[in-house]
Amino acid sequence: MNPPRGDAEARHTVILDAALQVFGQYGYRRTSMDDIAREAGIGKGTIYLSFASKEEVFQALAQRLAQRMLAGAEAARHRPGTTADKLAAMHAAWFGTYADTISRSPHAAELLDAKHRLSAGLVTDAGRRYQRLVRDVLAEAAATGELDLDTAGLTADTAAELMIASARGLESIAASSAAYRRHLDTLVRVMIAGLSRRLPAGPVPPGWHETA
């Protein structure tokens, strides 16, 4: 007899919460199902009711993290505010959440490593989906005339690629996840300001003098 759906989902959550702690502390290779069971406060056999192997636990946890980041970015996309506000909130949900996760656990980066054999596919797919979200926001802003991508020689796709690549690069200079979040916000606002459609220049303000 299968357990009630609510019980199965609750067990699934408890196992993945525990797995995040032990994978983050010891890394995938050093973590055992016994470690996960001990952290979860359940028997190892109970884990096998939800997952066939440690590999499945790892993949499910990576998928949960990626889905939460995407859900946060999707919600931010529809928030009130300017294009810069939306994209800054989206970057906070995607890159900021990732930075917060790895800052708390020495090995947590494995879970969202696009080169890890167990999570590469789903991480790559999630990254593409996030890039499409960013692209769509930029395309909408260009369509309304808020942004001028043409003058910069960009499409919405290439602008999204540039914004995301720049955000990744900022991680190497940030001293903390909080600093990274601040850098992300600044990056978005600087890029959007640079792409914003400008009105034709008006008369020179009184008292202004051009300097060489």
For each feature predicted by the language model, list its residue ranges:
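Basic, helix-initiating cap at the start of DNA-binding domains
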Residues: 1-26, 30-42, 55-59, 78
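Short secondary-structure transition hinges
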Residues: 89-136, 146-153, 172
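C-terminal peripheral helix-coil segments that are non-catalytic and often amphipathic
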Residues: 1-2, 89, 96, 100, ...
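Amphipathic, non-transmembrane alpha-helical scaffold segments
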Residues: 8, 58, 62, 66, ...
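Key DNA-contact positions within bacterial/archaeal DNA-binding proteins
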Residues: 45
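Base-recognition residues in the alpha-helical recognition helix of bacterial helix-turn-helix
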Residues: 24, 48-52, 60, 64
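Short amphipathic alpha-helix in the helical subdomain of ABC transporter nucleotide-binding domains
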Residues: 8, 83, 152-160, 180, ...
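Hydrophobic alpha-helical connector segments
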Residues: 60, 74-103, 156, 160
